[in-house]
């Protein structure tokens, strides 16, 4: 299941619908004693399967939209941090405060205190199976950005000299912006959970042992094979439908 693409799941459902079409066309010859593969049961399972596919598609669109909104909200973030940093430096704050701020700013902008990895860092990364020249040492995940932005605001609150005239750099404005960032990040988290739940439900309908579409379809194919024979045109009609 994990390796099946969204189109792969849809193909399984499409093949199942073709199987039902063939079984229906067989007329009275398709008359299984097993309740789970009777035509009415197959039609019900097909309806549920299509609904589960639709639910994933809807959740996927909602997730993509939430990600897009979050990206748009965060787009000016790095430039804002640069302006905050410059304003703090111009405020007359102590060297210690400035240095503390730089640690946070580097994390927010994905910059290291040093420009190269030392030998111990390289060995540690290689031991973990990482390719050193592709290692990202930034902390640019959205959760990390939010955490570090909150730390920066807390630091600014402790600096009486940080009192810019620029409205968007004022601490209250930064708090409001943080709340907006956090809300949009939570929107993505919520959408991702809903998408995950939709996929779990779909996988249950399609792949649950015995009652899922795949096992039911396989059982129906075996029944058709038993009725008409392995070399019959009826069985050949459905034998290439993969599940």
Protein language model regions, located:
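Basic/polar low-complexity intrinsically disordered segments
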Residues: 1-243
């Amino acid at each position: 299941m994990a390796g099946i693409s969204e189109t792969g799941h849809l193909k399984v459902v499409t093949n199942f619908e073709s199987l039902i079409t063939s079984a229906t066309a067989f007329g009275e010859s398709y008359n299984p004693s097993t309740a789970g593969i009777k035509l009415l049961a197959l039609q019900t399972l097909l309806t549920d399967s299509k609904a589960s596919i639709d639910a994933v598609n809807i959740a996927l669109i909602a997730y993509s939209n939430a990600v897009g909104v979050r990206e748009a909200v965060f787009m000016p973030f790095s430039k804002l941090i640069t302006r905050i940093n410059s304003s703090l430096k111009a405020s007359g704050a102590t060297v210690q405060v400035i240095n503390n701020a730089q640690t946070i700013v580097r994390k927010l902008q994905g910059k290291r205190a040093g420009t190269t990895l030392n030998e111990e860092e390289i060995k540690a990364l290689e031991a973990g199976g990482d390719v050193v020249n592709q290692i990202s040492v930034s902390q640019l995940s959205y959760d990390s950005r939010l955490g570090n932005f909150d730390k920066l605001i807390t630091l600014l609150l402790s600096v009486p000299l940080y009192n810019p005239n620029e409205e968007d750099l004022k601490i209250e404005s930064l708090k409001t912006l943080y709340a907006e960032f956090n809300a949009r990040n939570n929107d993505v988290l919520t959408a991702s959970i809903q998408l995950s739940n939709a996929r779990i439900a779909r996988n249950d309908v399609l792949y649950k042992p015995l009652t899922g579409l795949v096992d039911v379809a396989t059982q129906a194919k075996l029944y058709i094979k038993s009725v008409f024979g392995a070399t019959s045109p009826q069985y050949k009609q459905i034998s290439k439908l993969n599940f």
